[in-house]
Amino acid sequence: GGIFKTANKEHLSIDEIKCEVKNSYFLTGSFVKGDGQGHAEPSEINLEIRSTEEKSKIAELINKYSEKSPVLNALRTPLKNTFSLTANGRRKKLNNLNESKKNDAEDPYQFYTKQPSPNEKENFSDRMILKTGKVSEGTIEPVDGYNVSASSGNVPGNENFNKIIRTIVGNSTTKANDKIVEVDTVLGLPGMSHFIISMDIDGIKAPSPVNVMGAAISFCFLTQTHRYIQHQKFQIEGLRMSQYATFEKNSLSPLTMLPLDTHLFVNGTASDEDNERLIDMSERTCYLHATLTKCLIPKINFEIIN
């Protein structure tokens, strides 16, 4: 969507773009032992562009959009993300994490006076996220859950250590007049379910790509917190979160992302130490937080189809 929009401004003709995106992640350590560490590799973006324009012009176009894309800039910018913890209505001091300076983060329990529901007055896409029913060929196979190298300090190593990479694959085909980009996304393993995620570059009929990125980070982080609460038997309930992704732009530099600001709200009888430990472990195993802490230059490949 962004490339089409930029092409229109540059008076360049593009009929169709097929896009494949591969995001690869791996885990070292053990989720069970609580020493897991998520890692990310640079995204691979493969474009097949149907156009009669010269290849050099398309290359320049892609480079221009890459420089101003909020999502791609987030991948290129290493961030020291910030956090806050509010337990039973009281803000707690964090000892081992970067403390957020924001003092007015919204508690979802107070922000939403009633359960959120779709806006019936607006013509939104009914395919924002959809399980398609398609399943990748093959049979689901279990993996080794303890992935520690023999050189991991005092932690016993796994003699059969290997970097088990999980790749998320997204494919889309977008034509010049399309208002919404639909991405078929799947975990690149046998037997996995396919989903459709829809985006509107203007954020009108569906979330914008930046909105989708924010939702993905939130979902990934909260998934880890719920897993750890259950596995570690933390006395924590009523988990909710507010997250702020801020971008900075000025005339002297391209768009840059500022540290992701995450605010966790909990109830329960868990100690302050357990509450902070929950955030710490969840951040370390969240693949998307791992993505944001590194400078990961996307690999963009393209070919022109006449």
Question: Model regions: which residues?
Answer:
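Alpha-helical metal-binding/catalytic segments enriched in His/Glu/Asp
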Residues: 1, 220-221
